[in-house]
């Protein structure tokens, strides 16, 4: 059978360091407001697509988002776009967060966006981060990616921008 790596989230690490900083508190307050208004926390599915096995960034993002108050799901490693979309729908997530390091973003992310469009899924956003050359950003935005992050972005930026996009009146579609 096919190898399946298990991934888990270690929460509390990021929050214990930043819990008194205004940026951290601003985001956690926004998440609490979302919970009050929607009856549940914002939910993100963090994934790696294809054969990209560099999962450290995805683990860091997952742990930080949990500390911000998001419900966090982590997709198994080495998933195809259809498998990620299926899990995102089943888990009723608001955000699909794609971590990429191995240049699969040029084909795999547009394939994932096509799967979402084919299924008329318009109630979730897609964000991605990793080593994505600036020259590829327009292609990904055209495919429907809401935001793209790189090593220059802080985790606070990633959470804040992702939250802002998920609360826009029209997410995708």
Show which residues each predicted segment covers.
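Conserved small/polar residues in nucleotide/adenosyl-binding loops
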Residues: 164-170
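Non-catalytic alpha-helical coupling and interface elements of nucleotide-dependent molecular machines
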Residues: 1-5, 117, 163
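Compositionally biased, low-complexity repeat tracts
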Residues: 8-11, 146, 169
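Histidine-centered active-site/metal-ligand motif
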Residues: 54, 105, 165
């Amino acid at each position: 059978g096919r190898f399946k790596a298990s991934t888990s989230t270690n929460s509390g690490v990021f929050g214990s360091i930043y819990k008194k900083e205004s940026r951290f508190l601003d985001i956690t307050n926004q998440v609490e407001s979302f919970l009050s208004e929607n009856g549940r926390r914002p939910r993100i599915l963090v994934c790696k697509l294809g054969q990209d096995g560099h999962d450290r960034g995805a683990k860091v993002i997952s742990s930080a988002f949990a500390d911000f108050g998001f419900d966090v799901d982590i997709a198994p490693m080495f998933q195809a776009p259809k498998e990620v979309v299926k899990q995102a729908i089943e888990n009723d997530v608001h955000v699909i967060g794609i971590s990429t390091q191995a240049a699969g973003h040029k084909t795999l992310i547009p394939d994932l966006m096509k799967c979402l469009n084919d299924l008329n899924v318009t109630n979730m956003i897609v964000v991605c981060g990793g080593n994505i050359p600036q020259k590829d950003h327009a292609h990904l935005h055209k495919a429907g990616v809401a935001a793209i992050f790189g090593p220059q972005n802080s985790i606070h930026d990633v959470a804040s921008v992702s939250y802002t996009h998920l609360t826009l009146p029209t997410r995708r579609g």
